[in-house]
Amino acid sequence: MTRLILVRHGHVEGIHPPRFRGRRDVALSQTGIRHAELTAGRIARTWRPTAIYTSPLGRCIQTGAAIARATSACTKVMEDLNDLHYGDWEWRTHAEVQARWSDLFECWHAAPHLVRFPHGESLQDLVARVSNVLRLILDQHQKETVVVVGHDSGNRALLLQLLDQPLSAYWRVTQDPCAISEVELHARASVVRCINETQHLVSV
């Protein structure tokens, strides 16, 4: 059995008001830095990870670095963990997108599995990428604990895959900043032990 600890990066500017950050490389805020430190402590106290994989964006690298300092695990950047490519929507607020692409914005919330972002990706593209990371973990880290630091969208997609749920259920899973999800990966099945656990952040 391989244990997967799935973490979303800490708080960044651009969460409020809601906007499509995508691949814009924004650093952790001061709150996000504290999130990362608390998450690192929680992981170090509970598990002994042997490897940490992160998205190539700075907010995930910063979060992964905090976990590495606390656990002494090695960190590797994985391009396939990059955030969803929102194309023309990137860095626009939800209000801006709704005003300009009202029908597609409505579809994104009603049927996300049917959307391809203008000059960007679809959820199917995202799942194909994060699945590569999952296969690598299963191949190279049998009977180990591995941390993956990713983004809201990628983490949701990965959890849906592990839960054997369709992409139409995208909005039924949530991923808060520095939330932890724990998954046991067995040879023929996976067991999701917790999703979006944030008890370690109550002091922030």
Locate each region found by the language model.
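Amphipathic, non-transmembrane alpha-helical scaffold segments
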Residues: S29, I33, L57, Q98, ...
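Short active-site segment of divalent metal-dependent hydrolases/proteases
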Residues: V12, G154-N155
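Generic structural signal for well-ordered alpha-helical scaffold segments
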Residues: E37-A44, V127, S131-D139
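Acidic, low-complexity terminal tails and accessory targeting/binding regions
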Residues: M1-R3, T39, R45, K76, ...
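Short glycine/proline- and acidic residue-enriched helix-loop micro-motifs
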Residues: L104-D125
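Short beta-strand scaffold positions
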Residues: T54-S55, A128, V149-G150
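Active-site-proximal alpha-helix that buttresses catalytic centers in soluble enzyme cores
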Residues: T2-L4, R8-A73, V77
